[in-house]
Amino acid sequence: MKIIQIERIIDAGNFPQSHDWRKIERDIFQAIQSIEWPPGSGSFTLFDEPGKRRGQGSGVKPIKRACMQTLEALGWQLETSIGIATDRRPGPMDATYKIKDRLFCVEWETGNISSSHRSVNKMALGILKKILIGGALILPTRKMYRYLTDRVGNFPELAPYFPLWKSLDVDEGLLLIIAIEHDAISDKVPRIKKGTDGRALQ
């Protein structure tokens, strides 16, 4: 799988130049770029079928699980509950890595564009509250999203709001939006079904 674009929404203080960040960056890149389909192919090829209708396109959550399993193998904690923006039971972050008394989190978008906004808002607020040292939201390009089953949030839809988040006054932290994309499209590969185990993608 390819990383197409990385947008730094928050880039403040010493953390973005630290050894801790370089380790986290390597982990994230490895987790994304190691995702394969079909298994053992050495690349990520989506079935040539737009996901406009029910039952069509490739599943989103199995692709996410493949990334998360790699992060877990690299020492990350999965499904970490963090009370940032709610007084009720907080929803878990997909993956977190502890840096001293703060966390760096990774979210892989499987919902719609509203979900993408919530994820960025939650991570930005976590940085402002000094609960998080940073975060990264991973989501598809528009080119990739058209082959996925759900109307998942995508990079171009979120981009008009980048100036809003970039205007935040933060003294320490790093917040990234990472756009990913398939290596190829083919009608010779299987469709990734919604119920496919993430391990099958590695």
Annotate the PLM regions:
Residues R53-S58, P62-D101, N112-N121, L128:
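Active-site metal-binding core of divalent-cation-utilizing nuclease and nuclease-like domains
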Residues R102-F104, G134:
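Structural motif
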Residues K122-A124, N154:
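Glycine-rich, phosphate-binding/catalytic loops in enzymes
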